[in-house]
Amino acid sequence: MTYLAKILKEKRREVAAIKAERPLARYLELRSSLAPARGFQEALRGEDGRLRLIAEVKKASPSRGVIVHDFDPVRIALHYEEIGASALSVLTDRQFFQGSPDYLRAVSAAVRLPVLRKDFIVDESQIFESRLMGADAILLIVAALEPRQLRDYLQTASETGLDVLVEVHDRRELDTAAEEGATMIGVNNRNLKDFSVDPATSSDLRPFFPPDTIAVSESGLKTAGDIAHLRDAGFHAVLIGEGLQTSKELTGLTWPVSHSLS
């Protein structure tokens, strides 16, 4: 069984508990009192040609184990805000990434930046749950959904005020994302079947993005050279988690990154 299959199997078990909390009913009851979502997609849409940073608050991963032992999500998020991130991503998956919805709630309340809920969405109830916990955007993974699900979930997210980053890994998934109406697409350089990483995946797929789509590169970015390559390839933003914890090159850059990489 692949990594992704294992994760999705667990997520489908979790959905039963989520539905027991009646997130749709709670959303309908509370929506008039919810703060407007901060524009995640708009934060990445610059006309200046600079590459923007989505900084990920990440404690662990299935491939690396614990990355940050002294994990304080709010402290990390505030640091990312200080270094010039345009948006944040927070892992909420418990079993495989040691994340938590509580981390997202705390980060969303502490920062001004828009926040993406990074998790594996397999049911509509998780979308309402995301809005209630303070997310401004969600991730939808093409490999985890049927095309009709993707289309329906994009519509539901829009109706609740959430932006959507649609994640792809190959040309077929990119075409599916475009056909179902995605306006912000992220290329995951990590293959979710075996967790191998190939940074060239993003640049290989970039020419096939629909016009006016926000293009994001995710995973495996470690050096200033990686960043320069993606900027030159025409990406609007990069999503970086582990690299910001391990690479002084990346934290030393002035974000958003200009043509001079200074």
From Swiss-Prot:
Family annotation (Gene3D superfamilies): Aldolase class I (3.20.20.70)
Gene name in the database record: trpC
Domain of life, per lineage: Bacteria
PROSITE patterns: IGPS (PS00614)
GO molecular function per UniProt: indole-3-glycerol-phosphate synthase activity; phosphoribosylanthranilate isomerase activity
Known pathway: Amino-acid biosynthesis; L-tryptophan biosynthesis; L-tryptophan from chorismate: step 4/5
Record protein name field: Indole-3-glycerol phosphate synthase
Pfam families, sorted: IGPS
Lineage summary: Bacteria, Pseudomonadati, Chlorobiota, Chlorobiia, Chlorobiales
Keyword match Lyase: yes
HAMAP family found in the cross-reference section: IGPS_B
Gene Ontology BP, a term: L-tryptophan biosynthetic process
Keywords, comma-separated and alphabetical: Amino-acid biosynthesis, Aromatic amino acid biosynthesis, Decarboxylase, Lyase, Tryptophan biosynthesis
Similarity-based family: Belongs to the TrpC family.
Enzyme class: lyase
Chemical reaction(s) catalysed: 1-(2-carboxyphenylamino)-1-deoxy-D-ribulose 5-phosphate + H(+) = (1S,2R)-1-C-(indol-3-yl)glycerol 3-phosphate + CO2 + H2O
Enzyme Commission (EC) number: 4.1.1.48
